């Protein structure tokens, strides 16, 4: 399958045309190459790699070097897919100058297509400065995992009139600052609809209902690869973890029983002095 890679201007164009698209995650070359073979338009190398790939309890421990290390192979594996590089906690909050330096490192050292950072109106000035120097920025509001502890954990946001109004205001502030799209995470469907209608840039929803411009899920969640926890908003479209365990167990059983390897999976060249009698269950060396 061949697909045309999205560009930054395409995001707004898709929204204007009412064209939906999808957005998943990858943290390594192999997964990225699989995503690239699919019809998925956007892939994020998220700081969620801390929890999914490194076993951390939160995303906070992920470093800028970690992100660059994982973004590089995804860019190589998904040349026809728009690649988003996440900015980790502590790499942009200090000042606009720090954010610009960190974003430039990500873009220069990985060749990804944009950076994503978390935060609402409070981050607008930082984003404005980044966009002014030519950095394409994707915003992220609602549940922002890097600051989840201040919300009391990974919980739905915008569940009150005040909270909903703040999300709309945050989205408008980010649009005014120059983001080309905004991730909206874990909010009620009606609130997500209001946010989506309030701005001209696409809203990319994860756990945000059906009215957003783009649906987002973590690949490890939607393919049932992670295993430890599945958010309530995730539908599992395949069960890859189960298939992998079954395959590993089948290999283990055949290797121990002698069913594997058969001659079909062996090098059968005859070497003088080392002839063997081959069966499907054992090899016998000459005495």
Report residues per predicted region.
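N-terminal amphipathic alpha-helix/helix-capping segment at the start of soluble metabolic enzymes
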Residues: 1-23
């Amino acid at each position: 399958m061949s697909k045309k890679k999205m560009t930054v201007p395409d995001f707004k164009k898709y929204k204007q045309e009412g064209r939906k698209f999808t957005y998943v995650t990858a943290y390594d070359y192999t997964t990225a190459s699989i995503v690239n073979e699919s019809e998925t338009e956007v892939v994020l190398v998220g700081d969620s790699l801390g929890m999914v790939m490194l076993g951390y309890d939160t995303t906070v421990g992920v470093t800028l070097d970690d992100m660059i290390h994982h973004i590089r192979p995804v860019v190589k594996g998904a040349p026809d897919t728009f690649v988003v590089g996440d900015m980790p906690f502590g790499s942009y909050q200090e000042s606009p100058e720090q954010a610009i330096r960190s974003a430039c490192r990500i873009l220069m050292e990985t060749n990804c297509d944009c950076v994503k950072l978390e935060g609402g109106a409070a981050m607008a000035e930082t984003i404005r400065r980044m966009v002014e120097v030519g950095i394409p920025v994707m915003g992220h509001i609602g549940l922002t995992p890097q600051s989840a502890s201040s919300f009391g954990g990974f919980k739905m946001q915008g569940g009150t009139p005040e909270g909903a109004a703040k999300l709309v205001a945050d989205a408008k502030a980010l649009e005014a600052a120059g983001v080309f799209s905004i991730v909206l995470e874990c909010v009620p469907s009606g609130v997500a609809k209001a946010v989506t209608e309030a701005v001209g840039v696409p809203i990319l929803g994860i756990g945000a209902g059906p009215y957003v411009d783009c649906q987002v899920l973590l690949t490890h969640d939607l393919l049932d690869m992670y295993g430890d926890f599945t958010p309530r908003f995730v539908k599992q479209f395949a069960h890859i973890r189960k298939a992998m365990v079954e395959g590993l167990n089948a290999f283990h059983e055949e290797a121990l029983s002698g069913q594997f390897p058969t001659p079909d999976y062996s090098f059968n060249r005859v070497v003088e002095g080392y002839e063997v009698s081959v069966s499907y269950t054992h090899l016998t060396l000459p005495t």
